[in-house]
Amino acid sequence: MSEKELFNVTIVTTGGVCEKLIPYVARVTRGFDMRAISAPFVSKSQQEKDLELLHKLLRYKHLSVFEFSSIVFQIECPIYVARQLMRYRCSSFIERSLRACGPMESDEAYFAYNDAIKAGQKREDARALLPLSTQTRFLWSLNLRELLHIAEERLTPNAQAMTRDIVQKMVDLTSEHFPHVIEYWQSDRVIGYWKEYRKDSKCPTK
């Protein structure tokens, strides 16, 4: 991460899981005798059926099957942003100790914060000048269902800017490993938190 960047997001691992696992899990719940998940698609028609099922699962919000696919992210960002992300407890975190972070002159930060407020900056952004803006690094393990839930809440115009940018980057990176999941989810996202903004705002991920 360069000195000019305020955050960085990378994928550490997806555990070798691919999109084929999701329709597999869905069919297991119906008692079907399934082919090995590691095998290639049997035919184009079978692949089309899998993708159609994947789309239906998202459209009708049968989301429990997405809990079987997990991703581990490494995120670097200010502490105050990390704390917003760590409110989502259906996931696992491990964070770098503050003892590994350099010191910051609190008096200087305090005066800079007051100057920013007087200049009209929002408090939610001006607090980046306080010691809580110290950079931290953490690993975040979560399943696809939780990731989509977080994106529904944080990819909205009223979300804190850097938190929204981080979640956007997480979605972008996830699309490289689960392209159809993200594509179908974006195309159908006129539900949940997006209803409120559908008329006035464009989806940030479009």
Ranges and model annotations:
Residues 1-206:
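Family-specific signature for flavin-dependent thymidylate synthase
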